[in-house]
């Protein structure tokens, strides 16, 4: 998810302290108290990942229980994103106003309430409300947790401790998929899916009361003495004056830029923002949110017929996300973020084309990917019988279609209502030539069965797509953004790119099932593949190579107003370094 707005805050805080290395003291030491504090705070990451992944399996039961239409399923999924988008716009202000620790406590309590709401009040409305509150909770906690851990950690251990949150996110997604499988065949299993995580959220809220406030937040509020005491406890040393001075200098640097500078030519900030927004755009437009939210639904449609099989297959996606994230975290400094972005985008394109080609052979299975198959909503020709026929009260179009069709066959009929359900009483015409017969259930022939190799080819391609995203656009898009913006305006720049991220996530998730019904899943996948190719081209042309380079050097390169033009014209300043020395030396 995302939806990966959490990853952006992770990388932001991991790198922000390095923007002015000459002013930051070397903070050493990573005692048990710091590790414990980081683990407790990082539980928020587990909660975020769980909430992003659990709806995939819950929808398989909810769509039949609540008779959800295609559009209603999209709204259920997108409700979380609506809440997250709204929260992302004000999240930075809230954590600065009330504090990082207080925000985490609030979001944990809100998450408990939001998960229990649809369980206690089983209705479509309560489900939507609960998902919106969950979106608000995970968006705020994503920001607050990473900031809190980064501000507690010593500089030399900050990357490792903040990365713990990202690992917890993918672990939460895996946990959600496992729960989807375990409760797939349980009666009202969706209630267990929603309720299982609430005790952990409640325990985190209680545990956070015993952890210290962020020293940076205390200094921002003028409590320098309290901040000094917290640092002494965290660093196990009395010499904290140098670090206090560095924190104050960092806070002062944030006021050198104004928000509107992001849209101006100062230091070529407008071009930098364009790069950041485009990367956020590609994170979502390549289809990753739909693989996350609709994994079980899609896998069920390609031949994993039972709910349990689809949920088990989607669990593999969670495993791959966890395994793939580890090398991305530990090898990025050696390989480089741009290389990971290129490899990830290329593999994503190939994987999506593979799934699309397979799905062309199974098009009939995708046409009804999100329809509710109940007795009341089967097609007229497939379920028509004589006598009373019950039609769902919300299915006006089918009722009108039935009456029109019966009039054309000269059959007699009349309608009544019983307990809110329309009953259509049909009598066969005297002339049997009209062909009124009760159809026998269709028995699927062996030729209609989906070949095993196609099912597993589709699954393996989806796993390759997830792995490619987890080493590419997933974490690296936010890493690049953390390196292209100056420290003084980085937080405000991330607020804009975060809004783009959540907004595109909302748009993609809200339209996936509808567009799939309109054009078919194969063409949706081909469209995502095309966007992956576009992402590859964009990265090659416009994203700077940041491997092993100081942030000051990267910023200096991007500050050149002709940077974008030079990229389009394939002119790179590095070529000047390849000029033989003999050609520029004067003759002796």
Swiss-Prot record:
Keywords: Cell membrane, Cytoplasm, Glycoprotein, Membrane, Sugar transport, Transmembrane, Transmembrane helix, Transport. Glycans are attached at residues 377, 395, 419. It is a multi-pass membrane protein. It catalyses: D-glucose(out) = D-glucose(in). The keyword Glycoprotein applies. GO terms for cellular component: endomembrane system; membrane; perinuclear region of cytoplasm; plasma membrane. The lineage of its organism: Eukaryota, Metazoa, Chordata, Craniata, Vertebrata. Belongs to the major facilitator superfamily. Sugar transporter (TC 2.A.1.1) family. Glucose transporter subfamily. This is Solute carrier family 2, facilitated glucose transporter member 12. The keyword Lyase does not apply. NCBIfam families: SP. One of its GO terms (biological process) is circulatory system development. InterPro entries: MFS_dom, MFS_sugar_transport-like, MFS_Sugar_Transporter, MFS_trans_sf, Sugar/inositol_transpt, Sugar_transporter_CS. It comes from Xenopus laevis. Insulin-regulated facilitative glucose transporter.
């Amino acid at each position: 998810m995302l939806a990966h707005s959490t990853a952006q805050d992770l990388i932001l805080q991991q790198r922000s302290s390095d923007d002015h290395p000459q002013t930051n003291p070397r903070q050493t030491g990573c005692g048990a108290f710091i590790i414990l504090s980081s683990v407790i705070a990082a539980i928020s990451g587990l909660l975020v990942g769980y909430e992003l992944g659990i709806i995939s399996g819950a929808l398989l039961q909810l769509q039949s229980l609540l008779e959800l239409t295609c559009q209603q399923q999209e709204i259920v999924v997108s409700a979380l994103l609506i809440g997250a988008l709204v929260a992302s716009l004000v999240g930075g202000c809230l954590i600065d106003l009330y504090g990082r620790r207080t925000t985490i406590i609030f979001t944990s309590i809100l998450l408990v309430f939001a998960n229990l709401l649809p369980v206690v009040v089983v209705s479509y409305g309560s489900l939507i409300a609960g998902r919106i509150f969950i979106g608000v909770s995970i968006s705020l906690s994503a920001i607050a947790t990473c900031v809190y851990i980064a501000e507690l950690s010593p500089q030399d251990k900050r990357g490792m401790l903040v990365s713990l949150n990202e690992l917890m996110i993918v672990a939460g997604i895996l946990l959600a998929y496992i729960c989807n499988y375990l409760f797939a065949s349980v009666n009202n299993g969706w209630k267990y899916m929603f309720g299982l995580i609430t005790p952990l959220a409640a325990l985190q809220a209680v545990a956070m009361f015993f952890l210290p406030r962020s020293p940076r937040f205390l200094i921002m509020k003028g409590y320098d003495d309290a901040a000094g005491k917290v640092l002494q406890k965290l660093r196990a040393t009395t010499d904290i004056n140098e670090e206090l001075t560095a924190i104050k200098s960092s806070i002062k640097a944030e006021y050198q830029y104004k928000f509107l500078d992001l849209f101006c030519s100062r230091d070529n900030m407008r071009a930098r923002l364009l790069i950041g927004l485009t990367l956020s755009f590609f994170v979502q437009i390549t289809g990753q949110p739909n693989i996350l939210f609709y994994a079980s639904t899609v896998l069920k449609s390609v031949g994993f017929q039972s709910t349990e099989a689809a949920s088990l297959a989607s669990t593999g996606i969670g495993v791959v996300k966890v395994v793939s994230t580890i090398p991305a975290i530990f090898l990025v400094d050696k390989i480089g973020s741009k290389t990971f972005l290129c490899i990830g985008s290329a593999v994503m394109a190939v994987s999506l084309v593979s799934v699309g080609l397979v799905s062309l052979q199974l098009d009939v299975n995708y046409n009804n990917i999100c329809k509710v198959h109940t007795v009341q909503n089967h097609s007229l020709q497939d379920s028509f019988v004589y006598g009373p026929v019950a039609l769902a009260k919300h299915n006006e179009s089918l009722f009108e279609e039935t009456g029109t069709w019966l009039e054309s066959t000269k059959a007699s009929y009349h309608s009544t209502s019983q307990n809110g359900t329309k009953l259509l009483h049909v009598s066969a015409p005297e002339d049997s030539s009209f062909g009124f017969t009760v159809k026998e259930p269709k028995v699927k022939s062996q030729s209609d069965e989906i070949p095993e190799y196609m099912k597993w080819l589709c699954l393996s391609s989806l796993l390759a797509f997830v792995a490619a995203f987890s080493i590419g656009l997933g974490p690296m898009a936010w890493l690049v953004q953390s390196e292209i913006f100056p420290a003084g305006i980085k937080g405000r720049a991330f607020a804009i790119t975060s809004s783009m991220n959540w907004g595109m996530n909302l748009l993609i998730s809200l339209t996936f099932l509808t567009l799939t019904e309109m054009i078919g899943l194969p063409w949706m996948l081909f469209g995502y593949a095309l966007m992956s190719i576009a992402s590859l081209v964009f990265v090659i042309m416009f994203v700077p190579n940041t491997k092993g380079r100081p942030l000051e050097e990267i910023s200096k390169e991007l500050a050149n107003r002709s940077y974008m033009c030079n990229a389009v014209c394939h002119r790179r300043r590095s070529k000047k370094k390849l000029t033989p020395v003999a050609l520029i030396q004067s003759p002796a």
